[in-house]
Amino acid sequence: MKLLRKTVFAATLLLTAFGAHAQKKPAATAAAPAAANSLLWEVSGKGLSAPSYVFGTMHMICPADMQLSEPLKQAVRNSHQVVMELDMDDPSMAQQMQAGMLMQGGQTLQQLLSADDYARFGAYLQTKAGLPVDKVGAIKPFMLGSMLLPAVLGCQPASYETTFVQMAQEQKKEVLGLETVQDQLGLFDKIPYAEQSKMLADMVNKETEMKQEMQQLLGLYKAQRVEALHELSVKSLFGFTKYNDLLLDARNQRWIASMEKLAAAQPTFFAVGAAHLGGPKGVLALLRQQGYQVRPVAF
């Protein structure tokens, strides 16, 4: 049971908001160039009675690298609800996650990797995450990879998402999700398990490159360069480039309709993975295409 809770928690992190009263607004910059550097964006216009906000997260990040600035806190305070990729305060989330964690067809990691790669990954998983591979080998490989992110980051990671849930609860605000646990877990049934398993082997066999790429992503994130971060994410050595439409673009498109309805109802703070913000099919570009003014906020 303890092992299961640990696995579900890490996987959750991976999959890892217009009022009648006046609002104190974070200071938005005057212009909105597509390549402006910010993780926090104000969305206004198109009949909205008050702004909403979009923030780009890293689902797992070292506590020392988290930036909970006053403009970010103010954006949450200004909003009447907090909306993330998933409804993170749903009490049934762990149960839903558990129900969808396993590979279909009874497949296991041992069947998907060579004997050498399986042995190396098993030793690595035990050393870095304290997990016996024979106990978790039926879990979808992408989710198993989440168990190793603390080792790649070099810390016990924190989560913007859990922080925003806490802030929302303290401020008596509703937390909602743009998609369901089933939506997210279902994505990893559409990517061949063999390809996901290769990623696990690469995490061990190319550990240095993995850590270097993670530090590069983190550097771009801390510099708030959302366009460059998007470009690196879609070209990642350890990513799934040919599945960018499945993992990013198609999801962005689905989210926009929900985001429009939520923002029209009341000012909303949206928090999604930063890789979803940039690019011609990113959330920011799609909101502009729908006629909204999208401005970077000094963060």
Q: Where do the PLM segments sit?
A:
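Short secondary-structure boundary/capping elements
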Residues: 35, 64, 250-254
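Bacterial N-terminal signal peptides that target proteins for export
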Residues: 1-9
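Extracellular/periplasmic catalytic domains that process cell-envelope and extracellular macromolecules
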Residues: 34, 47, 76, 262-264
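Structured, acidic catalytic/metal-binding patches in enzyme active sites
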Residues: 39-247
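A cross-kingdom marker for long, charged
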Residues: 241-299
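N- or domain-start disorder-to-order transition segments that initiate the globular core
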Residues: 23-49
